[in-house]
Amino acid sequence: MNIELKDSSHGPVYAQVRDQIENGIRTGQLASGETLPAPAALARRLSVDQGEIQRAYFELEHAGMVKKESGTDFLGKPKTTYRMK
């Protein structure tokens, strides 16, 4: 899914990200079980603060649209992933 930000008149960054992901889920562009980009990676790609992406994911999780999973990567470092429900 390609997330694009508009200027600030379209709302805060986290809300734009959240709304685009919600729309992707509703239209079937994002399938159940599909993994979202890591918050840090998406923040870098969009040139925004990572907290904006984390807030969007948090709101999607609490709306029951995304599931947060904790685990470890292949080096044993903690890793969090977000998947579509």
Located regions from the model:
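Extreme N-terminal segment that seeds HTH/winged-HTH DNA-binding domains in transcriptional regulators
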Residues: 1-36, 41, 45-47
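Conserved segment of winged-helix/HTH DNA-binding domains
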Residues: 2, 80-85
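Long, contiguous secondary-structure blocks with strong helical propensity
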Residues: 13-16, 59, 85
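Glycine-centered flexibility sites
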Residues: 28, 33, 64, 71-73
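N-terminal helix-turn-helix
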Residues: 35-68
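Short, Lys/Arg-rich nucleic-acid/phosphate-binding segment
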Residues: 36, 68-82
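Short, structured secondary-structure boundary patches
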Residues: 54-57, 72-75, 85
